[in-house]
Amino acid sequence: MLTAFARAFKTPDLRKKLLFTLGIIVVYRLGTHIPIPGVDYKNVQECVDQASGNQGLFGLVNMFSGGALLQITVFALGIMPYITASIILQLLTVVIPRLEALKKEGQAGTAKITQYTRYLTVALAILQGTGLVATARSGALFSGCTVAGQIVPDQAIFTTVVMVICMTAGTCVVMWLGELITDRGIGNGMSILMFISIAATFPSALWAIKKQGELADGWIEFGTVILVGLVMVGLVVFVEQAQRRIPVQYAKRMIGRRSYGGTSTYIPLKVNQAGVIPVIFASSLLYIPALIVQFSNSTAGWATWITKNLADTAATPHIILYFFLIVFFAFFYVAISFNPEEVADNMKKYGGFIPGIRAGRPTAEYLSYVLNRITWPGSLYLGLIALVPTMALAGFGANQNFPFGGTSILIIVGVGLETVKQIESQLQQRNYEGFLR
């Protein structure tokens, strides 16, 4: 692998892409520390110190922003508005015929959907920025902090508007940086920024576990967590690479004096076809009712029930509902992202067939059957990998922001593998050996 990295840097265009990507990452990390007007950062730091790693409701969003959310910086919202907008557009594509038609128009349609995603991202950034500022002003952002109500000293409307504008502009810059990486760098830009945001929280989270440990001054807990994390990474890599290959043959055809077809290939169906999307969907859904309770500041019976059973990640109802939501969204996302009828029609159009299966509708039914069977273990794996770390490592003072939690590991491994594969394909195009030998 080190040799492959060396070869990548020796290739001028690859070196340029890698250095460009690294430069954008540096700019992104610098942006997470740029303050916005109207915030007393001395009080913010005091509240962060008092939180002692227990960041409550905002932990997931804080992880995706690389810790910028609870610091209330320009990039406080991170890429979460863009992720949410992308998910909403994907869902709307299924139910709105106009968007579905755009998706089938190729590059022009994709560009139009991307434009809609940008508009929706800005709208969501304004909403989320307003919610964050309102929460910070009320003191609910750090509920256990003694100076939480003094984070935003100036309660004027103008100050609030300026803060929201700064956060929205920061989200637009993050979106632009991600698109720059996609166009001129290595890998998918938004995925790379998400990877960096999560990885940036690892050192402080690990050190917090060491400080909270009691055995051998915390080093036993620290080492155990590292070991468990490595085992989990290995497991996730194994499952993410696992796939069912459906053999496909193409009939030989004579057009003029030339022979076409007669080749064999396969359709790769991954065990985890949905990726990390079901986990993000489930987390977002469970986040909404708890957020409503926090904004309403209600003490009614329904609010108490939600706080006790849904907002608490260690509560049994939360764990059960979270697991079933992940399984449901795994099947749902696979259904909207992989169309067996479309695949079968394309195979039939170009003379392809699955050995032993008739072309057309029987092929689509066979693909649906295989996909359903392979999605079951994939969805159960997603649910377990998202829950087991929380339950098994509760004794180490871990919370929903634990660095080796299901969501973070799935994203880190998934993005890492895709980026390495892209570099590998670029190397192989230049007759070099890649990483995955």
Curated annotation (Swiss-Prot):
Protein origin, superkingdom: Bacteria
Transmembrane segments: 19-39, 69-89, 122-142, 157-177, 189-209, 219-239, 275-295, 318-338, 378-398, 400-420
GO cellular component assignments: cell envelope Sec protein transport complex; plasma membrane
Keyword list, A-Z: Cell membrane, Membrane, Protein transport, Translocation, Transmembrane, Transmembrane helix, Transport
GO molecular function, one term: signal sequence binding
Main location: membrane
Coiled coil: none
Pfam families reported in the protein's UniProt record: SecY
Record-level GO BP terms: protein transport by the Sec complex; SRP-dependent cotranslational protein targeting to membrane, translocation
Subcellular location field: Cell membrane
Function: The central subunit of the protein translocation channel SecYEG. Consists of two halves formed by TMs 1-5 and 6-10. These two domains form a lateral gate at the front which open onto the bilayer between TMs 2 and 7, and are clamped together by SecE at the back. The channel is closed by both a pore ring composed of hydrophobic SecY resides and a short helix (helix 2A) on the extracellular side of the membrane which forms a plug. The plug probably moves laterally to allow the channel to open. The ring and the pore may move independently.
Stored PANTHER family: SECY/SEC61-ALPHA FAMILY MEMBER
Quaternary structure annotation from Swiss-Prot or TrEMBL: Component of the Sec protein translocase complex. Heterotrimer consisting of SecY, SecE and SecG subunits. The heterotrimers can form oligomers, although 1 heterotrimer is thought to be able to translocate proteins. Interacts with the ribosome. Interacts with SecDF, and other proteins may be involved. Interacts with SecA.
HAMAP family: SecY
Protein name: Protein translocase subunit SecY
Natural source organism: Streptomyces coelicolor (strain ATCC BAA-471 / A3(2) / M145)
The encoding gene: secY
